[in-house]
Amino acid sequence: MDSENRPFLKEDGSILTRPAGHGALIYNLNAMEEELVSIKNIDNVCVERMQPTTYHWKKVLMGRALQLRDRIRGYIFALDQISSAGNELNRLSGAQFITFNVQEDPYATEECQALCNEIESFLREELCIEMPEAKSCRERAEMLRKKLDRPVRVCGMVKNEGEPGGGPFIIREKDGSTSLQILEGAQIDKNNPDAVAALKSATHFNPVDLVCCLLDHKGEKFNLLEHVDEETGLISSKSYKGRELKALELPGLWNGSMSDWNTLFVEVPVETFNPVKIVLDLLRPAHQ
């Protein structure tokens, strides 16, 4: 669109089209068969002497992602055992089986409620997810399972030293729950003083250092396109042959395109972040 919000026309009268931003990469990621995928900005490079630190922390992120994935899978398996109750329901707890009476609602048992309590505590303490209140024991278990059954990502975060880009935030979702999200400055409501204050006081910065687990508890691929927030997007200011324009872009890859993922933020040393945005960045110690 032009500055008057009219379709931007080229010299020949055709409408100008342009790339939809890095959010389009979710289609590439969705086509991958690998279980574990590492994502890093292409301009985040360093000289050989600094590579060991980067490699070490990449392994830390991968290990943490697998640890988180395995714990989530364990909870899903436990909930599925309860939901598949027939004449008799057995759930393995440690080395013992717990047997539920045929007359008993498996979702209302002390064992199921204890499991739900444990899952809610895990979501709250590990992933900063506060769950909305459920209307019944069954709904509670189903809501928890749905929240668990999502792709997993672990995102490295460095201390904020004034670099341009997004950062880690806790937001309130439409269903009443909270979640961890990476937000760009353009996504912050500048008319909301609390939101602006949160942005200015941010202690950490997103260097784009992610590890993603793409398989579900059955070892099958998630359809990542089902976990994209289609209602989000970015309007960026660009130019074409000296003419200003407004470009609508897809939800950013690590923003709206991954908004419905189970997310964990891990602080990593600033030494792992060595961007080259402009030529003068090559004068930094990390590039000498």
Language model regions located:
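Short acidic, glycine/serine/threonine-rich loops at helix termini
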Residues: 1-4, 48-53, 166-170, 222-223, ...
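Beta-strand-dominated extracellular/periplasmic modules and repeats
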Residues: 133-143, 152-226
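Conserved catalytic alpha/beta cores of large enzymes that bind or transform nucleotide phosphates
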Residues: 43-48, 58-86, 90-120, 199-288
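Domain-scale recognition of functional cores that engage charged ligands
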Residues: 1-161, 175-181, 187
